[in-house]
Amino acid sequence: MEHKLEDIIAIFNQCFEEEYNTRLVKGGDEPIYIPENDEVPYNAIYFARGFYSSALHEIAHWLVAGKERRKLEDFGYWYEPDGRSEERQRDFEKVEVKPQALEWILATAAGFRYFASTDNLNGNPGDTQPFKQAVYEQVKTYAEKGLPKRAETLRHALAQFYGAEDRIDLAKFDVTRI
């Protein structure tokens, strides 16, 4: 199955451009979220380097962000660049569990392979298995309790577009493969 950038952009924008004044945009080397301002009259989620996986990841951060955070550049999150110590890596992973669980759910709805990202290629990521397990546990929680409204809207749209099953089937989530 081919995953075109034009498709994920169109699907996202159809779901959210009108109600949330938010667009998904192919960006450059680094992803960033920029709220509407004097120069750009809409909120923009810029994903990196034309990667479908980056689009899903940045969308997931937008889906987690509440109304007030969506008014801030990059949702007001701290970001420590690649090369983090193992301790700082654990802090980073704590804020990544929910977005990555949503990313995995969206990827599965689109028939796209998800890989957990610790985003620390030049540092010491340590044992990543606890992080992957935490992401899986969050997927289970979402499957049992339901997704937030915006996440469910997009999950449903992706499943319809890609002809996937229109539910979160935990049998399709294998923590050993991420």
Which residue ranges define each predicted feature?
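Short pre-active-site segment immediately N-terminal to the catalytic Zn-binding motif
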Residues: M1-K4, D38-S54, Q89
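A metal-dependent hydrolase signature that marks the N-terminal structural subdomain at the beginning
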Residues: M1-T22, R155-D174
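Catalytic zinc-binding patch centered on the HExxH motif and its immediate surroundings
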Residues: Q14, E19-Y42, G123-G126
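Active-site recognition of the HExxH zinc-binding catalytic motif
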Residues: S53-K67
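Post-HEXXH active-site segment of zinc metalloproteases
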Residues: V64-V97, F115-P125
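An active-site-proximal "capping" alpha-helix that borders the catalytic cofactor pocket
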Residues: E93-T108
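Substrate-binding/catalytic groove segments of enzymes
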Residues: L106-T118
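Pan-zinc metallopeptidase signature
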Residues: T118-I178
